Amino acid sequence: MDFLAKVIGDINNVLWSYIIIAMLIGLGLYFSFRVKFVQVRYFGEMIRLLGDGASSKTRKAQKEKSGVSSFQAFCMSTASRVGTGNLAGVAIAISAGGPGAVFWMWLIAVIGGASAFVESTLAQIYKVKDGNAFRGGPAYYMEKGLNKRWLGAIFSVLITVSFGLIFNAVQSNTVAAAFDGAFKTDSRLVGLVMAGLLAVIIFGGVKRIARAVEMIVPVMAIIYVAVALFVVVTNITAIPYVFKEIFLHAFGIKEVVGGGLGAAILLGVKRGLFSNEAGMGSAPNAAATANVTHPVKQGFIQTLGVFTDTLLICSCTAFIILLSDVHNAADLNGIQLTQQALSQHIGPWASIFVAVAIFLFAFSSLVGNYYYGETNIEFLNGSKVLLNAYRIAVLGMVMLGSVATIQIVWDLADLFMGIMAIINLVAIVFLSKYAFAALTDYIKQKKQGKDPVFYAESISGLNNTECWDKPAVADKEKAV
């Protein structure tokens, strides 16, 4: 076992220290230049589209249509993104890599926004019908766009095991630690409650999943941001110092000489990817479920999800920690560091608040992570027996994760996440021309004053699409 752990650790070091960082930053920049930094230029359009998808009129109309709304799909991907990485992961990055790690998390979010746009637009282009819903993601665009079902199958296995099983164990482990610190609650009870609540949702289908995260995600995000804003306002005079610390430690001479710069970059990129998932190939599984009139609409909304996760939620945690006196404490790490930092700002009840917040963040991640596995189980086989076996395995891992920290399992999650990212990034490079063409089509229609509507025939060479044939609009079912 020790030998296996060493091998996995060595592979992870190579993957995360060299290959993945180079690919994430390099391809993120490539996509950014090819789309002319659309993730910045069209930020206002992203907000508008999200608002339209969340309107009461849209939500009422969506109940009678296929698929889920663009806002529900956004909440599904955000549910997976916004989890323990936002509270515990940021704390780990700061304690091990210093304040400079925050800058690299920001950077990977900004340039990763372009990668998120490309992969989510492709997921919409190649989505398939599934009864009165849609499904899709990397496995589907690998099969239909690259004609490589075998590659899609490999990706499906990786995401099902890593997100549905291992990452969900990570989430429940962090919740158990937070509740132990705040209430001294038996970890087995925490795991049982989480598994029970999750079972009610995952046996109800994609629309029940969408409704659940649509309720949880906005509430938990607003409350957490409000608390963070209170901390910032009450420490407003220290904000310039925090920014100074972040940028000095990101590029400082001390870090270069002492080797700390590498740790800051490595941890910032790694935790940034774990948190916002840009380019990893996970969020496209949620993006494909949306019923929209143009793939670019959901590409924009999923890009906004990356920014919401890292530039907003992760930054809240970073400022809570860096505005405290405990961020250099050697004996604090992970969720305990976040709890102690917030306690310094708002009093001892902060540990209770963080425990509840981490429960909501993590539970929403359990739901989102589960769905990623489900849609890929359907790609692989679609057997009800296999799907139910997967559901039971997910619930078992939630229970196991609450009571056990098995380092080799966490290392295996890092390995699978890295391989997933590499496979997905290579795939979207080869297919990106269709996302670029779809963006051109969208912008052209917007300039003509139209609400953009997409047809596959508008892009030369685009084949094997199921949901974008021109005759399909004859039924007048208007998407959101």
Where do the protein language model's features map onto the residues?
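Extracellular loop-to-transmembrane helix junctions
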Residues: 9-49, 95-132, 308-314, 351, ...
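Extracellular/periplasmic helix-exit of transmembrane alpha-helices
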Residues: 117-126, 131, 227-245, 253, ...
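Transmembrane helix-loop junctions in multi-pass membrane proteins
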Residues: 2-4, 34-39, 85-90, 165-176, ...
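Flexible loop linkers connecting adjacent transmembrane helices
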Residues: 37-68, 89-102, 114-146, 327-345, ...
